């Protein structure tokens, strides 16, 4: 049976742990708000780009880009986007569980974040590249990932590129999501994914006629690549929002559990202390009666 000294030491240790998890909860909460705000601020920009692609697609007829080439999928690349650190509940475990669906002999992997890189290396999967990204991803980081995927596809090394990441739903809910990055859909579908209204659909915004130089197709060739970068950026922002949300919830649960444990240990300490006092009083009373 533990002594009162042992219980006091354990209470002190648990309180110290609770202070650490509380601080980590506050940091994750602050980062989560920034990541969510970054995703929200990005949406209008992505929508405007989608509107422009939609307008160009209507003017350029049956536009086709090399990244839109559809072929039989014999080899596939998967971009796995996850965290650099742990302590985020089951977020990484739930995401990595989805990797079991892929045939290792025909699939190569691209890690975005340290945790997926470590997992892929540990499970002996074919890791061809590793990328890092900040809490608010820079355009250069998004472009590097996008460019690497484009090169694999255009050189014929893979026939399709998927992105596996954790989709942000709300603070308490994040879900693994699989998105096809390459080949790209048609121009109209690509614009719709970016948030634009489908061609011919009613729109509340005023329409304008644009004059493109040198021609819509040349502009489209550039814009399609930008839209691909935007899709990568949106995925990275959602992954970061999911990470910080999961970490905040995990640290909050750890803090709550520590506080409950402190209450339980304090009650146990008081009971043991009361029992010791009662025992000492009985011993004193018994000794007094024996002397009397």
Go through each PLM region and give its residues.
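C-terminal beta-strand-loop-alpha-helix "lid" module of Rossmann-like NAD(P)-dependent dehydrogenases
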Residues: 1-292
């Amino acid at each position: 049976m533990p002594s009162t000294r042992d219980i006091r030491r354990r209470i002190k240790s648990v309180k110290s742990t609770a202070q650490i998890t509380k601080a980590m909860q506050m940091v994750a909460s602050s980062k989560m708000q920034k990541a969510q705000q970054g995703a929200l601020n990005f949406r209008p920009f992505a929508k405007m780009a989608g509107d422009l692609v939609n307008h160009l697609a209507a003017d350029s007829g049956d536009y086709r880009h090399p990244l839109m080439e559809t072929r039989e999928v014999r080899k596939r690349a998967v971009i796995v986007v996850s965290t650099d650190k742990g302590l985020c509940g089951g977020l990484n475990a739930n995401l990595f569980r989805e990797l079991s669906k892929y045939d290792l002999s025909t699939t190569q992997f691209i890690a975005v974040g340290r945790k997926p890189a470590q997992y892929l290396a540990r499970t002996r999967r074919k890791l061809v590249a590793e990328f890092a990204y900040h809490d608010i991803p820079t355009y250069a980081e998004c472009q590097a990932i996008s460019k690497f995927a484009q090169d694999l596809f255009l050189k014929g090394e893979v026939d399709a590129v998927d992105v596996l990441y954790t989709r942000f739903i709300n603070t308490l809910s994040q879900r693994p999501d699989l998105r096809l990055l390459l080949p790209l859909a048609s121009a109209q579908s690509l614009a719709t994914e970016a948030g634009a209204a489908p061609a011919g659909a009613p729109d509340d915004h005023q329409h304008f006629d644009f004059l493109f130089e040198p021609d819509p197709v040349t502009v489209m060739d550039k814009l399609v690549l930008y839209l691909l970068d935007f899709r990568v950026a949106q995925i990275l922002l959602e992954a970061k929002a999911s990470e910080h949300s999961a970490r905040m919830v995990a640290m909050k649960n750890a803090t709550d559990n520590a506080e409950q444990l402190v209450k339980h240990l304090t009650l146990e300490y008081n009971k043991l202390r009361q029992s010791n006092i009662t025992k000492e009083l009985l011993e004193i009373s018994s000794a007094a009666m024996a002397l009397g």
